Amino acid sequence: MVNVRERVSLKVGINSNAPAELLSFNGLESGKEHIALIFKDAYKAFVPLVRMHSECLTGDGFHSTRCDCGEQLDETIEIMAELGGIILYLRQEGRWGLGLYNKIDAYKLQSQGMDTYEANNHLGFDDDLREFSEAAQMLTALGIKDIRLVTNNPKKIKDLQQNGINIVEVVGTKAHLKEGNEGYLKAKASHGRHCFNFDK
């Protein structure tokens, strides 16, 4: 059974320097060190705002132009610093859970003309290897069943619902277009059915 292991206060956010609480968990079957970042005691809210964010070293840490992961994380932190909410930061590197080295191999193939899905398939992987059952278990450990989910990804909605989480509302993020990631975002929209508004 998943339960809260430890919690500590800290400040986060490039612009906001917002107070938050960082939580670790016991009982995660994968052994991965997933964490929760909680703003304004959001777990006490009737229907908290929640985002699941898969670790992306190149985007989150190095601000790579190949994806929009860092921008999505920064956007969510700023929103939740103001409104409250929970970020479940999932240690499944790469948007498809490939692992870092396989992700680098996929980048190489993308440089040769493949889109992100074609590159992953060429390496022998399915479109999306991530699964979100442990995210649902983390929410359950916090006593949360009903959420407002911040996502553009229909797979996240489906996986959480299949694991007993009731999604009251879906809140989209912006399409963070920049030099180098337009093809990536459009592949997610056309192939992965992600819901983007490219006019924003």
Swiss-Prot record:
Gene3D superfamilies: GTP cyclohydrolase II. The active site is at D128 (proton acceptor), R130 (nucleophile). Zn(2+) binds at C56, C67, C69. It is an enzyme of class 3 (hydrolase). InterPro entries: GTP_cyclohydro_II (IPR032677), RibA (IPR000926), RibA-like_sf (IPR036144). GO terms for biological process: riboflavin biosynthetic process. One of its GO terms (cellular component) is cytosol. Its cofactor is Zn(2+). It holds the Pfam family GTP_cyclohydro2. The keyword Ubl conjugation does not apply. One of its GO terms (molecular function) is GTP binding. CDD domains: GTP_cyclohydro2 (cd00641). Pathway: Cofactor biosynthesis; riboflavin biosynthesis; 5-amino-6-(D-ribitylamino)uracil from GTP: step 1/4. It catalyses: GTP + 4 H2O = 2,5-diamino-6-hydroxy-4-(5-phosphoribosylamino)-pyrimidine + formate + 2 phosphate + 3 H(+). Its EC number is 3.5.4.25. It comes from the Bacteria. Keywords: GTP-binding, Hydrolase, Metal-binding, Nucleotide-binding, Riboflavin biosynthesis, Zinc. GTP binds at R51, M52, H53, S54, E55, Q72, E93, G94, R95, T116, T151, K156. Binds 1 zinc ion per subunit. Belongs to the GTP cyclohydrolase II family. Catalyzes the conversion of GTP to 2,5-diamino-6-ribosylamino-4(3H)-pyrimidinone 5'-phosphate (DARP), formate and pyrophosphate. This is GTP cyclohydrolase-2. The gene is ribA.
